[in-house]
């Protein structure tokens, strides 16, 4: 499942009982576009929720999560950030981190 995160649905998305991968991106960022391909593949899994947030449309959310470079991927479980990756991230690294946060006890 791939969700476009914004200030209106932010709280609802974070309340998921599944692990969450949150990408902060900009539509003009080349590395963001490369990372999104891997995110889309991993979003097909029922084991995780994948959300992306356009920092040009939602700068307050980017600031709230201390995003200073793009793309930034946050791996969240039970509302807590378990991992932060900055820069282009290959789909296999995304999958490994999803597996890692899925193995963390609730």
Predicted regions and their residues:
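N-terminal "domain-start" segment that seeds a small globular fold
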Residues: 1-12
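Short active-site neighborhood of thiol/selenol oxidoreductases, capturing the structured segment around
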Residues: 15-27
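Non-catalytic, surface beta->alpha helical segment in thiol-disulfide oxidoreductase systems
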Residues: 77-106
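Short loop/turn elements that flank and shape the SAM/SAH-binding pocket of Class I
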Residues: 12, 58-60, 92
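Thiol-based oxidoreductase modules, predominantly thioredoxin-like and allied folds used
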Residues: 4-5, 24, 43, 47-60
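Structural micro-motif
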Residues: 65-74
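The canonical Cys-X-X-Cys-His
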Residues: 29-32, 73
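Typically the conserved alpha-helix immediately C-terminal to a functionally engaged Cys/Sec
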Residues: 31-45
């Amino acid at each position: 499942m791939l969700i476009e995160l914004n200030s209106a649905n932010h709280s609802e998305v974070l309340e998921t009982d599944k692990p969450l991968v949150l990408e902060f991106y900009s539509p003009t960022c080349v590395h963001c576009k490369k990372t999104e391909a891997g995110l889309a593949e991993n979003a097909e899994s029922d084991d995780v929720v994948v959300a992306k947030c356009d920092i040009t449309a939602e700068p307050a959310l980017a600031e709230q999560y201390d995003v200073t470079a793009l793309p930034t991927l946050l791996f969240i479980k039970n509302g807590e950030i378990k991992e932060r990756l900055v820069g282009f991230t290959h789909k296999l690294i995304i999958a490994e981190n999803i597996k890692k946060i899925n193995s963390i006890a609730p």
